[in-house]
Amino acid sequence: FNTVRLQAGSSFGTGFFYDFKIDDKIYPTIITNKHVVNNKEIEVISFHLHLSDGDKGSDENYKVTIKTKWYFHSSKDLCFCFINPVFERVKMETGKDVFYIGNDESILGSREKLEKLSALEEVTMVGYPIGLWDEKNNFPIFRRGYTASHPAFDFNDSGIGVVDMACFPGSSGSP
């Protein structure tokens, strides 16, 4: 309930929900890589959303195709879009809320937490490698791997860490 399979033209990849909190207000977004949305500020994307069944997700999915505005990081292959307008549209069209679980800053590792980790840690990637997914139930594929650089150190001053994992096209944007 945290990821979406994004399709932008002939390109596809993964996006994940992230809730920005500003002045006690939550702003839900989808974060992905720029190249997933073809490096275009405005892009038509398609994805399926789980609809709400009270306080949990239902087995009902809803396909959305929208033209959306992406906000790009100035130097990283990273972007986000505000998703609340999509949630409002889905509510208007179906009478149901979208069920999602958004990440937030609480999942980000503090310097102290990162320094306590070993250089070799098991990691999990959630996404849609080579287009694989459980289309009927709208669920992603889970992959496991390991850190290939120490999580506390900025690999080559690039602002990233390195993992050793079987990653395929479509995994881009995975959390």
Residue ranges and their predicted role:
Residues 1-12, 38-169, 173:
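Serine endopeptidase catalytic core focused on the charge-relay Asp
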Residues 32:
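Cytochrome P450 catalytic-core helices
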Residues 35:
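Histidine-centered active-site/metal-ligand motif
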Residues 3-29:
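A conserved glycine-rich beta-strand in the N-terminal activation segment of trypsin-fold
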